[in-house]
Amino acid sequence: VAAVAPEFVEAQIDAVFDDIPPAAVKVGMVGEAAACSAVARALARRGAANVVVDPVMVATSGSALEDSAAVRALVEGLLPLADVVTPNLAEAQALSGVSIQGAADRRAACERAAERIASLTPGAVLVKGGHATVDASDLLRLADGTRVWIEGAHVDNPNAHGTGCTLSSAIACGLARGAGIEDAVRAAKAYVTGALAAGLDLGRGSGPLDHFWKVRQGGSFSAFV
C-alpha cells in the first residue's frame, strides 16, 4: 500500500468542501498517523457533519492494517469528531481492551467494549458482529447510552470483501439523506445483508458484494427507499 502525502490528503478534503460541501463523511482506512491527523484537522476546521469513522485496523484475516502511531492518531484525532464509529469485533477488542471473540458471553463482552469505546467519542458506537460464527447481530450503542441489538443471520458467502466498508458508507448515505442514526444503521445492514445474499461471484479469491442487487431484483438502487 502506497501512502498518500498528508498535505495532499488535506488539500483534497479542502477542495471537496470548497466545491460541494458534503452532507456526510465516511472515513475508512487511513494507514499512517500523519494522514490520519491531516484528515482530522481538515474535518474539524470545516465543521464536517455526519462523520462515520470505520476504524479499519484489523483485516478479516487478522492482519494489522495500521501501526500503533496511526491508531493513536485515530483515537485522539478522529474519534472525537465521529457521529458513528463502526469497529468489527477485532477492532472493538483493540480499541477497548475487552476480549470479545473468546468470551463465554459474547454479547455481554460487546456491550462492555462499546461502553469503553463510547468514552473515546461523542457519537454512537456500532460493534459489528459479522465476523462471529453463530450469527451476524450488531450492537448499536447510541450517544445517550441506549443499547440496541440489531439482529442478523450469518450469510454463507465466501465473497465478502468490503462488507464493513460498504456498511459504513451506507450508514453515511442514510445520515446524508436525513435519517436518524438507528434508522440509517438498520437500513444499511439490510442493504449489506441483501448484497451478501445475492451471491455475486467475480474473479478469484474473496470477491466483492453485489452492490446492485436491488436493481437486479427490479427495485430502487437506494437502500433507504
What kind of feature is each model-predicted range?
Residues 68-147, 156:
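Conserved phosphate/ATP/ADP-binding segment of small-molecule kinases
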Residues 93-94, 157-181:
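Short, small-residue alpha-helix embedded
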Residues 1-65:
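Conserved N-terminal subdomain of the carbohydrate kinase-like
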Residues 1-9, 61-74, 100, 132-142, ...:
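Active-site-adjacent loop and "lid" segments of alpha/beta metabolic enzymes
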Residues 34-44, 123, 143-147, 182-183:
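Nucleotide and nucleotide-moiety/phosphate-recognizing core
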Residues 182-225:
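Charged C-terminal helix
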Residues 109-118, 148, 180-195:
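Short, well-structured alpha-helical segments that form the helix of a local strand-helix-strand
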